Amino acid sequence: MTSSLLIPTVIENTGRTERAYDIFSMLLNNRIIFLGAAIDDRLANLVVAQLLYLNQQDPEQEISLYIHSPGGNVYAGLAIYDTMQAISNPIATWAVGLTASMGTILLAAGTAGRRIALSHATIHMHPAGGGTQGYTTDVEIQYKELKRMDDLGQAILAKHTGQSVETIAADFERDRWMDAETAKAYGLVDQVSAQSIKAVAEG
């Protein structure tokens, strides 16, 4: 999904015909979405479109969302989050590699019992960032918006982890890094995968 990378093509042979898919389309055909970059408007639009497509194809079958992302734009991430909450499908979320910031919120937002971290995944939480500069009034407006985003992120994480908003707020004061087991104890995921992805996916 990054233009500078060579995207592999997969050939599907049905016995009568052959069809070529790029690897992400092939995954989508198997109800798998891979969020593997910093979250911006473009990536969010792609993920939202895929979620809506899979929901239209089958409103009950599970969707798998694999996340390897340093986070990114909060507004774009919330577009993905709200879509995840709006559709009827159960969504299995997978932490792969690094899942940070907004990526961590999306990880926690998966269907209860179906939030999984691979054994060497790293999960990271931190407050909404961004320097403020300009006229005093502008700085105050920017600060209020950052505070609103922080409060919203904390409320969402409290909802999905079972932690209190106060605990989340305290942990948001500094960067917090977790391994897979720590993330499970915190309530960000339900399982740490010690078996094959196929075995966990089949539940």
Where are these regions (language model features)?
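N-terminal organellar transit peptides
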Residues: 1-104, 108-203
